[in-house]
Curated annotation (Swiss-Prot):
S-adenosyl-L-methionine binds at residues 260-266, 283, 316, 335. Mitochondrial methyltransferase which methylates cytosine to 5-methylcytosine (m5C) in rRNAs and tRNAs at multiple sites. May play a role in the translation of leucine and proline codons. Changing residue 390 to A: In mj457; viable and produces viable progeny. Reduces body length. Reduces mitochondrial tRNA and rRNA methylation state. This is 5-cytosine rRNA methyltransferase nsun-4. One of its GO terms (molecular function) is RNA binding. GO terms for biological process: tRNA processing. Disruption phenotype: RNAi-mediated knockdown does not result in fertility defects. It is an enzyme of class 2 (transferase). Residues 106-145 are annotated as: Disordered. Pfam families: Methyltr_RsmB-F (PF01189).
């Protein structure tokens, strides 16, 4: 009897064991891994949700929706004015003309002089505080709310360009004798760094013509039209990409370096302002250089004088040790590689959130810091650098700026000041097309459905010494 009972129990447990194995869920087959775009969205929900709070659902929806464009009129095309009128008849307005207003020419000089006088005083004050850290420390103790470091100042010095660069200086770089040294970037250099800030006066290039539809208008621009020699009369550009070029504050005969120039939209915008005398377009990857060259061949006529302003270079902008262009440019644009948030949630090809690209994505802040360090070394004293990304991530935005400012000060003796973008933000917000999110440094354009631009982060730094 005991043998029968033991056999029955054994048979019973055997049935349960086989039943469990037979119907066990095959996770690998029934639940496939998430796509890179889905992983990116989960990542953004986790990190950006708390950062943006109630704004995040709107920003998230904007990221997942098609972005909107501006039409940049190509004034190098022979019949751009006729096509400009066509877009005007469709209801597209001239964005910069509406911001400038009718009375700008009369008011700009008076305001410029007033702001310049304040800026000269504030610049000397900042330099004095930097050279006398004990004084700065006492001031910080008595005025903890950044009364010194975030005080209103004014426009920086309007300084004329030092002249055109020779081909030799462009090819070989300037002042490379004692600057070639290896710098280790840890990502913590910016802890405790406070960057002086001053107000900045903006004026918008008269030669730039940018068309945009009003907020919430669902019309799309037609395909760009071409003149008789095949040069398009305009091209489409994300509205956020306009701001870094405006933030440069280009002046007549400036020399401009675009450190990560491909695909070339921002360099072309700078050329259309008719202000720079030389535009050096740099990119390290041959494929991107080819893309840049095709853009120039498409939008710049062969017989145009503008084509002579461009110089194409292939240098690794992230190599601090071998970089050899020092104090060579009046303005430097640094549109660095980033996580490209909008593309990350919409496409899987080349997505940095794929498993194989994890380390590349984690290394982005260090790469960006090195590029910005080289940019600050390349700009002349009194010149400006505009840093920009198309991500919402603070670790690729404000943190990179703080780290780079600390590195150039400690390792190269370069002192910088942040230029306030308040005027630019105010003007663009008043157009009804842009929405900004407050940041400790710079300005951040965030997507929103009625006029879906960005994301785009910009920060402007001026070199004092």
């Amino acid at each position: 009897m005991s043998c029968l009972r033991q056999s029955s129990q054994s048979f019973y447990f055997t049935q349960i064991r086989w039943k469990t194995v037979k119907f066990k869920t095959k996770i690998a087959k029934t639940k496939p891994l998430k796509t890179p775009s889905a992983q990116a969205l989960d990542h953004f929900d986790f990190y950006y949700g708390p950062l943006f709070g109630k704004k995040w659902p709107s920003i998230r929806l904007g990221l997942l929706s098609p972005n909107r464009y501006l039409a940049v009129m190509n004034t190098m095309s022979r019949n751009w004015q006729a096509h400009d009128e066509i877009l005007s008849d469709m209801g597209a307005k001239d964005l910069l003309a509406s911001i400038r207003g009718k009375a700008e020419d009369q008011a700009i000089e008076t305001k410029r002089k007033s702001v310049e006088e304040k800026a000269n005083r504030e610049t000397q004050k900042v330099k004095h505080e930097i050279s006398n850290p004990s004084t700065s420390t006492n001031t910080e103790d008595s005025e903890p709310d950044e009364a010194i470091f975030r005080s209103a100042a004014g426009l920086g010095e309007f300084r004329a360009s030092a002249g055109e660069l020779s081909s030799g200086s462009l090819q070989m770089g300037l002042g490379q004798s004692n600057q070639n040294k290896n710098v280790e970037i840890t990502g913590f250099e910016g802890e405790g760094v406070r960057i002086p800030k001053r107000d900045h006066f903006f004026y918008y290039p008269q030669a730039l013509h940018v068309r945009s539809f009003d907020r919430a208008v669902l019309l799309d621009f037609p395909a760009p039209m071409k003149d008789e020699v095949g040069v398009p009369s305009y091209w489409l550009l994300d509205g956020g990409s306009l701001l870094p070029v405006l933030a440069l504050g280009l002046q007549k005969d400036d020399s401009l370096l675009d450190m990560c120039a491909a695909p070339g939209g921002k360099s072309l915008l700078a050329a259309l302002s008719n202000l720079p005398s030389k535009i050096v377009c740099n990119d390290f990857k041959l494929a991107r250089l080819g893309q840049l060259k095709r853009a120039l061949m498409t939008y710049v006529p062969e017989d145009s004088e503008t084509i002579d302003k461009f110089v194409l270079k292939r240098k690794d902008a992230s190599d601090v040790k071998t970089w050899d262009e020092f104090e060579a440019y009046d303005k430097v644009l640094v549109d660095v590689p980033c996580s490209t948030d909008r593309l990350s949630v919409s496409t899987d090809d080349g997505n940095l959130f794929s498993t194989g690209s994890t380390q590349q994505r984690l290394d982005l802040p260090v790469l960006q810091t090195k590029i910005l360090v080289n940019a600050l070394r390349s700009v002349k004293v009194g010149g400006s650098v505009v840093y920009s990304t198309c991500t919402l991530s603070p670790s690729q935005n404000e943190a990179v700026v703080e780290n780079a400012v600390a590195v150039v000060r400690n390792d190269f003796g370069i002192v910088t000041v942040e230029e306030s973008l308040h005027q630019l933000v105010s003007h663009m917000t008043s157009s009804g097309l842009y929405r900004f999110h407050d940041t400790p440094l710079g300005a951040l354009v965030v997507p929103f459905l009625p006029s879906n631009f960005g994301p785009m982060y910009i920060c402007k730094l001026t070199r004092l010494q």
